[in-house]
Amino acid sequence: MSQLPVLSGKEIVRLLKSIGFTEVSCKGSHVKLKGFRAGEKRIVLVPLHGELAFGTLRSILRQAGLTVKELGDLLK
């Protein structure tokens, strides 16, 4: 999967929780999640707006330590 799918913030939060991230706080329209990937502590901020822009989605993936391919595998 080389292209990013169109996802909402709520869908990303659900995916991150499924791989072990936990919700730390929710302030306004953003959720802060904490988790561990590859032995590193990761903090991810996810906006809960409608569909996420591709740049925002890429930034969230980078913060979470995920690749586009791993995201595709999680969506299957």
Regions inferred by a protein language model and the residue ranges of each:
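N-terminal first-folded block
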Residues: 1-27, 37
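Glycine-rich, flexible loop/turn motifs
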Residues: 3, 42, 71
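A short, structured beta-strand/loop element
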Residues: 23-55, 59
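C-terminal structural segments of small proteins and small subunits
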Residues: 51-76
